[in-house]
Amino acid sequence: MATDGASCEPDLSRAPEDAAGAAAEAAKKEFDVDTLSKSELRMLLSVMEGELEARDLVIEALRARRKEVFIQERYGRFNLNDPFLALQRDYEAGAGDKEKKPVCTNPLSILEAVMAHCKKMQERMSAQLAAAESRQKKLEMEKLQLQALEQEHKKLAARLEEERGKNKQVVLMLVKECKQLSGKVIEEAQKLEDVMAKLEEEKKKTNELEEELSAEKRRSTEMEAQMEKQLSEFDTEREQLRAKLNREEAHTTDLKEEIDKMRKMIEQLKKGSDSKPSLSLPRKTKDRRLVSISVGTEGTVTRSVACQTDLVTESADHMKKLPLIMPVKSSTGSPLVSANAKGSVCTSATMARPGIDRQASYGDLIGASVPAFPPPSANKIEENGPSTGSTSDPTSSTPPLPSNAAPPTAQTPGIAPQNSQAPPMHSLHSPCANTSLHPGLNPRIQAARFRFQGNANDPDQNGNTTQSPPSRDVSPTSRDNLVAKQLARNTVTQALSRFTSPQAGAPSRPGAPPTGDVGTHPPVGRTSLKTHGVARVDRGNPPPIPPKKPGLSQTPSPPHPQLKVIIDSSRASNTGAKVDNKTVASTPSSLPQGNRVINEENLPKSSSPQLPPKPSIDLTVAPAGCAVSALATSQVGAWPAATPGLNQPACSDSSLVIPTTIAFCSSINPVSASSCRPGASDSLLVTASGWSPSLTPLLMSGGPAPLAGRPTLLQQAAAQGNVTLLSMLLNEEGLDINYSCEDGHSALYSAAKNGHTDCVRLLLSAEAQVNAADKNGFTPLCAAAAQGHFECVELLISYDANINHAADGGQTPLYLACKNGNKECIKLLLEAGTNRSVKTTDGWTPVHAAVDTGNVDSLKLLMYHRIPAHGNSFNEEESESSVFDLDGGEESPEGICKPVVPADLINHANREGWTAAHIAASKGFKNCLEILCRHGGLEPERRDKCNRTVHDVATDDCKHLLENLNALKIPLRISVGEIEPSNYGSDDLECENTICALNIRKQTSWDDFSKAVSQALTNHFQAISSDGWWSLEDVTCNNTTDSNIGLSARSIRSITLGNVPWSVGQSFAQSPWDFMRKNKAEHITVLLSGPQEGCLSSVTYASMIPLQMMQNYLRLVEQYHNVIFHGPEGSLQDYIVHQLALCLKHRQMAAGFSCEIVRAEVDAGFSKEQLLDLFISSACLIPVKQSPSKKKIIIILENLEKSSLSELLRDFLAPLENRSTESPCTFQKGNGLSECYYFHENCFLMGTIAKACLQGSDLLVQQHFRWVQLRWDGEPMQGLLQRFLRRKVVNKFKGQAPSPCDPVCKIVDWALSVWRQLNSCLARLGTPEALLGPKYFLSCPVVPGHAQVTVKWMSKLWNGVIAPRVQEAILSRASVKRQPGFGQTTAKRHPSQGQQAVVKAALSILLNKAVLHGCPLPRAELDQHTADFKGGSFPLSIVSSYNTCNKKKGESGAWRKVNTSPRRKSGRFSLPTWNKPDLSTEGMKNKTISQLNCNRNASLSKQKSLENDLSLTLNLDQRLSLGSDDEADLVKELQSMCSSKSESDISKIADSRDDLRMFDSSGNNPVLSATINNPRMPVSQKEVSPLSSHQTTECSNSKSKTELGVSRVKSFLPVPRSKVTQCSQNTKRSSSSSNTRQIEINNNSKEENWNLHKNGHLEKPNK
């Protein structure tokens, strides 16, 4: 290596690198680099790397010495002292490098030459090393590949040998198995034949068993019906006997009690006493059954104890009376709240439990079980007395009842309920709980009875209570005491009457009862607050007469006030609030709130709510030392826990001293509706206004509070709404009207909180402080807004109350109104301009409060209610416009106005970080959350302090709402492409149908979208092909991929998203949500594969014919080439044939053949020559000499029923069956020339016949064609209409299937049943030519909410299509055996009067049985449309009869020989109500006559055949007989249809509101006549529409209701007269049900006359 460098520079051979260069040269001569091994190359590389490192060191050292060498070289030999040397130096430096040579050798040049040489050698060495390494690697790889190939070659060779051996064995085994299988196939074929033979035998046996089973079921059904009828008769008889027994026992008991009373009276009269006036008159026990003594005491919390003692012996007539509520005085000296109610004995009812009857008699002693009461503090509540089966208060001293006495059961209200609801035990006819005494008694007797009824406990003058004996005690001493007490009470009554009576010194007000013998009457029935020192003044006068209106039940007021309970505005006004385990009933819904029923004697007895009478001061004189106790109760539920302070007492306990000289009357303004609360008190304070409301719980704290000075009195008057007292106090001088109690409640606050608008107005006009706050910072406006008193709110706002005042907790009036859902108050505050964004100390806003209660109206007002432009001058028009849609239903508010609240308020978070949306979502208030979501500024992703979003805390419903917040609803439609013109029967088929709407969310992926589309299609196909009304949700659990009609996701040809094509499984770069929005796709269209693709999926969906059947039809056409489709007219034959031809054409074209469709319509003038020309011109018939072409021809012959098949096709049958040149046929052309032709195999012939069955000579053609029969009672026609109409309904509802009870579903089901039952009846009549296919019913209109449109369409279809076809079919059948000389057409053109009668009868029967029956329209609406149907009036009046006695038995069914329609299935599609068990029919003798047999005895069926005894009279003005046997058969069939089990129950169709009068005739033959009084029906005066009849005629009164909610259609069918007896029995028996029928049987009548008399009314014959 060094040699190369040395040769270039021989002068450097003595350099220090010569040694290394010589070594390298020697090494190169010794070896070549290319031959080195890998290890040697590595070693050489390391040596060279070391050498390079050494050279680098040398270079660095030389660089270090470079400066020194340079200086030495340049200046070493010069001396600076010599200027000439310096000049020489400068000369050398200034000259060029090439001109001057250094004076001495330059070591730097040597170094640079060495460095350049080393670099070159290094580059060459590295290149050689890289090449060597690459070659080495390539070599090693090739060696490895070679080894691998060799191994694989060896393996393959070995495997090949193994496979050769195995193949030889397999071939040998296959040969053996082929031989064995060929033998087995022969054996299996033989076995199959045997099994098929056995199967046929089993089928025959099974059919026989099925027939026997059906007969057995029929017999069992009849027997079961008979048993049920007998059981019902036995039940009725037992109930009658039991009722009779009860009456007798009751009568016996009454007589015994009368005897006992008479004996007692005789004994009392014998003893002779001065106390006779205390004895009440003898009364029947029936006037007083239950005597209840209701006592209330007042403790720490006033409670009412009601104890009942029931003194009724066993009663047998199930008659109960309401308890007679008797006032009882207290047994202690403490104050009592006496339930001083008037006695109540209500009218009897029969629904009390029998267990109440068994009670012991106590000899009419009332006071025997009056409990002695403990001290007031021990009293507990017994609401409405002890419950059934329990005893009274365990602390009472009630003696135990005897063993034969039941505990008290009648629940008498201790506090009479204000909501006029009777106790549930009594089930009274009168809804009032406590009516007055028995209404049948004289008022004076009532007064006397009430006056002289003694109290159980009467306090003496000192307040001490003595236990007095009962009022009817036989002791003369007790009677004397009682008389003395009565006299004393009357004296006190007269003395105090001028203070207590409202009409003292004044003329009596209208409506007041007449005065009695005591002078003026004190109030009666008022629950009084008494002290032990005040005499009772409420005895001795008669109770008031009960009002006529149930809502104004004059019951005693509760002994403590009604509590203001904050309840939801949606709650009913008559619900009670539960207070201390005691139900306090609220005001009755019929009375305005605040108009209490007080002092029943002074109220006008009117049926409308009355305002309170003019008030008078009602003062009682209290002795010295007796304080007037105030009633104290606790207020429960009056304020939420979040707002302390509003439920505190209003004043402290204080004494009250009022002069006893105040007695005046003053008039006041009518009290507002919300200003009064029911209550009762006789205290001095509250009676000043003329009624007795007790003190509100606001003013009470704890126990009894004595009333104190004027400021407290002012507060109490304001709290109660006592306007008279309040105005009186306000007129006094020096009274502080702004005085507040210890809680800070002022009089204005109390009045505003309790909603006393008049008091508020008085106080405000007296300049009370409008913004005075209590200790919690609540102002009167806060209290009124919280309680919902909007009139007080409006009044306070008008007096400049601070609408934005915040309490200590930051609650503003708006916040409190929202918290309690008071919509009117919110509206008033918003209109006044209140601030919506004030926050509480907890960070809650009014929006939080409204959402927290779930009140949608409050939230809408907050978000959308705008402040009127003119400030407080807010008129009604602005009000209406600003409350835009609080009741607007589904309309979105953003379409009307935008929210007025900012996004900051909507998204404001409280102390916990929760926004209003958090609260709504967590509580499940979906409506509130939806309103919040409508605000564009809502941030649903905002997180609370626990890092939770709205979605995280939401309920499932709210999560669904949030997920669908921005979802796109894209309708999914199915398209079948273009449908051919309407002449193929496709005019009613729809091209596109909307099946559902897909919800596409932001997070929806393309896979989810594909699954959703596939699932929606599958669900839709299953829903429309199901048997019932399915919704899309109902079928999601069904995992089957194919529906009943054979369609699935595989039937899709293409899908377009808007206008962009897409396929299932395909994905785009954008998500489905972004893709739909960007492309503005308004719908997704699914196109089904159709005939153009050689498929029939679109045909299946358009026609609802199952895909399997369409494919089978196509296979028949391809296999047999000659196919004719036949069925009733309207069976879509033309459409099916054309679609099959299109599909076949495209299939042939796809196979490479040219194809053509030739269509010909056959009419009556279509001749055989025209058909020949058609065959020849279309190249179906080819001359024998001519070779066939490859072109395919499809010929369609439509309407073949219009010509004779045998005449038209007779000459073509043989060549069509054998298509070859070997069987030619000679045809003569029109020019007279004859030529041989044959049909080639590429010709397909299809025909259509609109006829249910072939007859006569046409049957000769049958064996030469493949026939496809489209039967109306078999698939595909059987379910086609149902599937089509269901799909139509789904499309009308935009993919949402309605519920089965929806009116649209009912009207569609009715249209479907009309088609099925119409065909069933026509098949039964033997008129197959009148059968209808479903095509006519495909146009059934589906208009939600307008069912009458469908009925009108049905009437047009009946008049235009059905009735003419039926008329023609009936006439043609009735004239089959007419004189041979005249043709059938003659009979049709000129029908006889008998034939006209039969036609009219048939039309009427069909209309009522098949069309009008089951129509879901109400009867009133249906009657309006009945006149539109032709033939519904059945105008026949017929008198003659015919008899078939001379007919042979077998002739009755002769007309059926031409009827090939299946009769077995005629009742298959009858509605469920048609298959009711026949209660009186023994059975039908044969299919021709279904004889009505009223005798349930089986021996009757063994008599002479009823066929010869049946007669039907169809009479016209003159006597005429039916002209032919077929007419007779038809008449019998019509009669049989009326009584058929398989058809609808015609008797059930008759509307019970018609006046049905049925008379018995004298003699053995009952005759039925009917008078139908219904002005809505089109019946002329001279005609009468005959009644419908089934096996049992339904006789009910005018109040009977339609069964099962289906309106019945009036029937116009004749009624057999053997059903008359039941009517008279049922009309005599009012208590029997309509299901219990007793039929009187006349075994002597063998004939049933169907009478349709000319006159509408028959005289009732004399019996």
UniProtKB/Swiss-Prot annotation:
- SUPFAM superfamilies, alphabetized: Ankyrin repeat (SSF48403)
Q: Which residues fall in a compositionally biased region of kind Low complexity?
A: 386-396, 1624-1638
Instruction: Map the ANK repeats onto residue numbers.
Output: 709-739, 743-772, 776-805, 809-838, 842-871, 912-942
The name under which this protein is listed is Cortactin-binding protein 2
The organism's lineage is: Eukaryota, Metazoa, Chordata, Craniata, Vertebrata
Which superkingdom, per the lineage?
Answer: Eukaryota
Q: What binding partners and quaternary form does the record give?
A: Interacts with CTTN/cortactin SH3 domain. Interacts with STRN, STRN4/zinedin and MOB4/phocein; this interactions mediate the association with the STRIPAK core complex and may regulate dendritic spine distribution of the STRIPAK complex in hippocampal neurons. Activation of glutamate receptors weakens the interaction with STRN and STRN4.
List keywords of the entry alphabetically: ANK repeat, Cell projection, Coiled coil, Cytoplasm, Methylation, Phosphoprotein, Repeat, Synapse
Give GO BP annotations, semicolon-separated: regulation of synapse organization
Q: Which residues form a coiled coil?
A: 119-276
Question: Key word Transmembrane present in the record?
Answer: no
Composition bias, Basic and acidic residues: 1645-1663
* InterPro entries reported in the protein's UniProt record: Ankyrin_rpt, Ankyrin_rpt-contain_sf, Cortactin-Actin_Reg, Cortactin-binding_p2_N
This protein's record includes keyword Repeat: yes
| Localization terms from the record | Cytoplasm, Cell cortex; Cell projection, Dendritic spine
Q: Name one GO cellular component term.
A: cell cortex
Q: Which residues carry this modification: Asymmetric dimethylarginine?
A: 498
Chain intervals with Polar residues compositional bias: 583-593, 1561-1574, 1582-1599
Function text: Regulates the dendritic spine distribution of CTTN/cortactin in hippocampal neurons, and thus controls dendritic spinogenesis and dendritic spine maintenance. Associates with the striatin-interacting phosphatase and kinase (STRIPAK) core complex to regulate dendritic spine distribution of the STRIPAK complex in hippocampal neurons.
Transmembrane feature ranges: none
Q: Which Gene3D superfamilies match?
A: Ankyrin repeat-containing domain
- Region (Disordered): which ranges? 1-23, 203-222, 367-440, 454-478, 498-614, 1448-1483, 1560-1663
Query: Which residues, renumbered to this chain, carry the PTM Phosphoserine?
Result: 1524
What is the protein's species of origin? Gorilla gorilla gorilla
